[in-house]
Amino acid sequence: MRNQYGKPSFKNKEHIKFNISHCNGLIACAVGLEEMGVDVENIRSFDDYVVRRVCNMKEINDIYSSHDSKRTFFTYWTMKESLGKALGVGLHYPLRENEFIKNGDGYLCNYEGLKIKNYEIDNKFSLSICTDKNQEIILKEVNLNGR
């Protein structure tokens, strides 16, 4: 089943929440009992137009003053997308109005009760998971290539 924004859910198992994302051979899947969102992106070049369209001034300044602007942009991008997925609206929310505040090993945002953790994978991917702030996040790697 999917909601009006395309977020999937299990039919007859609504208490089990999940979210998926994939990029260049990497698949991220989050499963739990609370709403969550996950996004993974390959760290690569980005379009300045996209930055100005989806980022607020603080984020734009962070991106362009960073020693690694690609990594900084995709950290913000995956956090924004994981947040939208956790809210169940995808990218249909005011992307520039949110503020991500570093808090310990994660980030808080304007939506009370949610936290976001960002991970770098193999120096090539940015992965963000948005969950209820009390939900524990456990990462497990599964290699489907048998290696």
What are these regions (language model features)?
Residues 1-147:
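Core catalytic alpha/beta fold that binds nucleotide/phospho-ligands
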